[in-house]
Amino acid sequence: MRELIKEIWSTSKRNKLRTSLTGFAVAWGIFMLIFLLGAGNGLINAQLQQSTRFLANSMRVFPGETSKAYKGLKEGRSITLNDKDILISNKTYGQYVDDVGGRLEQYNVNINYGDNYVASQSLVGVAPTHPKIDKTELIAGRFINEIDMKEQRKNVVLSRSQAKELSKDYRSLVGKNVKISNLNFQVVGIYKDDESRNNTEAFIAYSTIKTIYAKGDDAGSLEFTIKNLKTKEDNEKFEKNYRASI
């Protein structure tokens, strides 16, 4: 064993450059292995976190484009969702869906409180059922409710990140007024967000955003929970019929 060590040491002294390069290659390989393992675990954790964010039996429907030509109309036409689609979801598919609501967004709005502000935020109009679907956790105040919807109240629910930018004592913002697009909104709640991400969503009533920003019958996207679909075949049939009806 001693002779082997002497031989290795002697060879290393005679070939210093090759020894150095070999050592560097081994060290670099170990570093890359650790880095890739860490990145892989990070991606897995991010995917798990994203998949658990939404209720398991929830569904979100987005507008898109047509994939086929129809009666002289070309493919690639824009598909928009409107209030009629909310009614169809409730009436035609009532035995399969619950908590149907629209989700409308107004981008690049500023939120001001005194001399403090947060820029380029997204104002999102949702139904009171949204926290159930999106698993929104409130840390102060309340979420949008049915009275806000019915009376089109200018009430807003801020993220914790937004509230912290506006006030050091961010919980004290509940009950205070902030300005959004030069309109006064009362803060009724603050929700917990993932501060490692860029959280820019502030929630108001779906009916309010439609009125203030003249959205007409545009529904943006739809979100709802699903029930009474027990097999894969049931789910595939529902998806096919639902897509065809809207």
Q: Can you describe what each PLM-predicted range is?
A:
Residues 1-31:
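N-terminal Sec/SRP start-transfer signal
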Residues 7, 45, 83-88, 237-240, ...:
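Generic recognition of well-ordered alpha-helical segments
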Residues 29-40:
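Alpha-helical transmembrane segments
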Residues 41-108:
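Membrane-proximal extracellular/periplasmic loop immediately following the first transmembrane helix
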Residues 79-86, 91, 99-150, 198-208:
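The feature marks short, hydrophobic/small-residue-biased sequence motifs that occur predominantly
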Residues 95, 121, 185-189:
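Small-residue-enriched segments and motifs
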Residues 129-143, 154-246:
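Mid-to-C-terminal secondary-structure elements
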